[in-house]
């Protein structure tokens, strides 16, 4: 986006939210400045009247894009926000999808995105873990098993499609969704190195400045005991 037409972007986020991290990474890759507003999930701030008014799902992230000549755009689902950012940014920005001339590669990217965002994240997020706890479910084992199931599927596809990253040699939407899932997997005790393509791609992604600035350990709301410098 050109500076003269750049909208004001606000991201309601939580430092450890994988869905929020997707947008932090994407915004950084596309060099889109944004203002982060922290929503503390552990304190239940996502269920506050103020957050519900912005995000009826009572979740994060919420992306608000304010254009000079248009009504503000509010997007409350991370994948919809990623697609929106892809559509409003020029070709000269970092594209998160392969070119339209390669629909096959775009389909692979979207398949990998769906594995992380539909198969893994919804059943391992904090809200679901709280719901299953009264049934005596081992939350750690639940998360670990379901993450590993998703990683096996991702690995099988990415092993064929990967170059430097999950699909070819450019960072795509698949990688933007993969790395936050890897952070969550490590927290759940998954040995990510069991999935060699995922592990290799994640290691390379961690070297990117856009990723370092989006990392859960470098956010304004990251507690001091977890904080590291993004430099």
Swiss-Prot record:
Major enzyme class: isomerase
Induction notes from the record: Expression is positively regulated by the cluster-specific transcription factor hmgR.
GO cellular component term, pick one: mitochondrion
Gene3D superfamilies: 1.20.1050.10, Glutaredoxin
GO biological process, one term: L-phenylalanine catabolic process
EC number(s) on file: 5.2.1.2
UniProt-recorded Gene Ontology molecular function terms: glutathione transferase activity; maleylacetoacetate isomerase activity
Superkingdom, natural source: Eukaryota
Domain GST C-terminal: 102-224
Alphabetical UniProt keywords: Isomerase
Keyword Isomerase recorded: yes
Domain GST N-terminal, chain residue ranges per copy: 7-93
Family named by the database record: Belongs to the GST superfamily. Zeta family.
Protein name: Maleylacetoacetate isomerase maiA
Source organism: Aspergillus fumigatus (strain ATCC MYA-4609 / CBS 101355 / FGSC A1100 / Af293) (Neosartorya fumigata)
